[in-house]
């Protein structure tokens, strides 16, 4: 097969080029060695730019042409003018450029990764709305792909990830495909894929976790650690990222910035794929949350934004929107009596919500018993309040509490999915200092009693609640019960005031602001001149 000429290659790449340009006699084309034989359709050996990039290439070729006859020069001038007009009219085709349009999929055939939008990697192109879709190029109308990186080290990271996913679906429908992945568990080898188990062990042994948290905080400690870790897991993590072919990447975990950003930088993709961080700690947060190469860092509070600035991020990288919570918390709340009837609660007695997290941890039973005594008026022989207990996945605790003969109305639930309804049925909440639960309680206007926290990332949540007049802190079940009894009795004004303070501090629209800003980043970043094959 003879080697293709420049004009034949251009014709193959874009049949719409002016016939006059393609019929230029070979003496008018710059002298150069023969071009290599065209590769097979699945090869990424070379690429032919489309749009304005082609005009630049042709301009260089024409200017490289030396002296010729006057007639030939005149003809070349006319042909070039015609071609320039063509470029102005037809050369501005653009398409989203992310992993998919860069041809970085790991599937065979060049039609895409085979997962989500973009087809199943069948190779070759097709005609779409009269435009030729060339191999390796994502369809302009295909959904953009969002990849959320998280880890199940505590429930807050997954909850934030699912909230962002739900908001994307609610706001943009089929325009986006959203994938949530535990990057370390799913895409790294042992022992790195044991991160959730290691975290669970450490937080159960407080001194060990405290030493780990504060010992890795200095940059001179964690940066070399990430650099060394990248040596062992970069290949696997890169494959994990390419599997999803994202157009934008969101990290909701402090350990999901450094290694992925090193990979994107090594592949030259930092300017093409926005990488963003959504910080899910309300006040104190580990320094690994902040990386100077992120496109955007979404902070839940002014305190966190100050830490981001101190870590070296620019003000243009930082947005203070609040903590993302499930979109269902933004919907209008149903009447309290209706919610209480559905939950089997008394319609008139004030209610306290006692939570133990997803695993039902903490002094739940002791606190529930203390509340049962404090909310019963021995003189009148009647209850002054009621209790709704959420035990999570702790079935033994659920069974024990359900077997108790209570003097006050008590409803015991296991793992619940509609927390907004449970909160809407109650007047205050007792919980550990998890940021997600605090943010949700504030949206519902519930005064908060914090009964514990994890050293490090949750320590700052206690003053965040107390100093803003939204609640109190105590580890004593008896003292907690007394606070609730006072709120339901002689100190009801304090309960109302704290409810108002919580509503003032709440940011119910945070998740929607985040996804709309992400949408704008994708719109700005991913539209570049289209290429016919992998970059």
UniProtKB/Swiss-Prot annotation:
Molecular functions (GO terms): 1,2-diacylglycerol 3-beta-galactosyltransferase activity
Subcellular location, principal: plastid
Full protein name: Probable monogalactosyldiacylglycerol synthase 1, chloroplastic
Cellular compartments per GO CC: chloroplast membrane
EC numbers for this chain: 2.4.1.46
Keywords linked to the UniProt accession: Chloroplast, Glycosyltransferase, Membrane, Plastid, Transferase, Transit peptide
InterPro entries, sorted: Diacylglyc_glucosyltr_N, Glyco_trans_28_C, Glycosyltransf_28_UgtP
Pfam families, per the entry: Glyco_tran_28_C, MGDG_synth
Subcellular location: Plastid, Chloroplast membrane
Catalytic activity: a 1,2-diacyl-sn-glycerol + UDP-alpha-D-galactose = a 1,2-diacyl-3-O-(beta-D-galactosyl)-sn-glycerol + UDP + H(+)
Xref: CDD domains: GT28_Beta-DGS-like
Organism taxonomic ancestry: Eukaryota, Viridiplantae, Streptophyta, Embryophyta, Tracheophyta
Top-level taxonomic group: Eukaryota
Function noted in UniProt: Involved in the synthesis of the major structural component of photosynthetic membranes.
UniProt source species: Oryza sativa subsp. japonica (Rice)
UniProt keyword Transferase present: yes
Family: Belongs to the glycosyltransferase 28 family.
């Amino acid at each position: 097969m003879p080697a293709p000429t420049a004009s034949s290659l251009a014709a193959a790449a874009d049949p719409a080029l002016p016939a006059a340009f393609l019929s230029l006699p070979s003496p008018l084309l710059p002298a150069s060695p023969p071009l290599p034989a065209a590769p097979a359709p699945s090869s990424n050996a070379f690429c032919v730019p489309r749009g304005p990039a082609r005009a630049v290439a042709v301009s260089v070729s024409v200017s490289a042409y030396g002296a010729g006859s006057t007639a030939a020069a005149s003809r070349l001038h006319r042909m070039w003018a015609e071609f320039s007009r063509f470029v102005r009219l037809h050369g501005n085709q653009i398409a989203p450029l992310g992993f998919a349009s860069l041809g970085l999929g790991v599937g065979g055939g060049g039609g895409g990764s085979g997962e989500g939008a973009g087809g199943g990697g069948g190779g070759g192109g097709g005609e779409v709305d009269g435009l030729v879709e060339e191999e390796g190029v994502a369809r302009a109308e295909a959904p953009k792909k969002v990849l959320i990186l998280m880890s199940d080290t505590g429930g807050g990271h997954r909850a934030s990830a699912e909230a962002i996913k739900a908001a994307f679906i609610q706001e943009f429908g089929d325009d986006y495909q959203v994938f949530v992945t535990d990057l370390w568990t799913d895409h790294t080898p042992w022992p790195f894929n044991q991160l959730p188990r290691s975290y669970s062990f450490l937080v159960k042994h407080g001194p060990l976790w405290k030493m780990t948290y504060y010992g890795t905080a200095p940059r001179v400690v964690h940066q070399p650690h990430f650099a060394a870790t990248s040596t062992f897991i970069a290949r696997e993590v890169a494959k994990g990222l390419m599997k999803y072919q994202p157009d934008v990447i969101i990290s909701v975990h402090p350990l999901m910035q450094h290694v992925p950003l090193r990979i994107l930088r090594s592949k030259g993709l930092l300017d093409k794929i926005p990488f963003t961080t959504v910080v899910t700690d309300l006040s104190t947060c580990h320094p690994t949350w902040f990386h100077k190469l992120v496109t955007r860092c979404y902070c839940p509070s002014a305190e966190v934004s100050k830490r981001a600035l101190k870590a070296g991020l620019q003000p243009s990288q930082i947005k203070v929107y609040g903590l993302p919570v499930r979109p269902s918390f933004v919907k209008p709340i149903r009447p309290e009596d209706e919610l209480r009837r559905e939950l089997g609660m008394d319609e008139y007695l004030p209610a306290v919500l006692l939570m133990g997290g997803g695993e039902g941890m903490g002094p739940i039973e002791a606190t529930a018993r203390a509340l049962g005594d404090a909310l019963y008026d021995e003189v009148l022989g009647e209850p002054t309040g009621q209790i709704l207990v959420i035990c999570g996945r702790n079935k033994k605790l659920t069974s024990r509490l359900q077997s108790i003969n209570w003097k006050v109305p008590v409803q015991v639930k296991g793992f619940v999915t509609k927390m907004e309804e449970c909160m809407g049925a109650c007047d205050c909440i007792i919980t550990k200092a998890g940021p997600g639960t605090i943010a949700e309680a504030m949206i519902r206007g519930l005064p908060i009693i914090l009964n514990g926290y994890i050293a490090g990332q949750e320590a700052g949540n206690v003053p965040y609640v107390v100093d803003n007049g939204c609640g109190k802190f105590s580890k004593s079940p008896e003292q907690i019960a007394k606070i609730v009894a006072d709120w339901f009795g002689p100190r009801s004004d304090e309960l109302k005031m704290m409810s108002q303070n919580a509503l003032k501090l709440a940011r119910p629209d945070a998740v929607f602001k985040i996804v709309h800003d992400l949408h704008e980043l994708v719109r700005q970043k991913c539209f570049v001149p289209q290429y016919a094959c992998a970059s």
